């Protein structure tokens, strides 16, 4: 049985992942942890095979830029370092497509990151800090999802969905 620890216990992705595992009876033991409480540092990570790091500050207009770096970069690297030090073999970092900036065209493996927001910049810096920890005993996977949506999702999707139903205008997109 794989043992997984999810950071960001209240995240939409984390809750949805847990529901999926439970619904399909997949043989994983999943725990969650809230990194807002400094007691997380006392948690024994050695019992886990994988950490899925979802904890983040996303697009909050009222936040100072420094909080993005404190949470999205510094905390992420600290969690990854603790995981490595305690023998976790897999670390999955959820980053963001925002690392590419807002005005990019088609994104492929040659696309260079060029973040424009504190959110995107802090996530890219987290990627760079965490990838340095990778070795033969500690595998790092970095995912850069676009907008996350689904039933009961938070964020902009519901607003965009409602707007698209009111305005009958769709841009022509050459989707490759």
Where are these regions (language model features)?
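N-terminal Rossmann NAD(P)H-binding glycine-rich loop of SDR-like oxidoreductase domains
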Residues: 3-23
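SDR active-site strand-loop-helix element
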Residues: 7, 51-55, 91-97, 143-145
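Adenosine-cofactor binding site in Rossmann-like domains, unifying the SAM/SAH pocket
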Residues: 28-43
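NAD(P)H-binding glycine-rich loop region in Rossmannoid oxidoreductase-like domains
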Residues: 40-85, 99-102
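Active-site segment of SDR-like NAD(P)-dependent oxidoreductases
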Residues: 58, 97-100, 104, 113, ...
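Conserved Rossmann-fold NAD(P)-dependent oxidoreductase catalytic core, especially the SDR/UDP-sugar
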Residues: 78-118, 133, 141
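Active-site helix of classical SDR
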Residues: 122
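NAD(P)-dependent short-chain dehydrogenase/reductase
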Residues: 139-142, 146-176
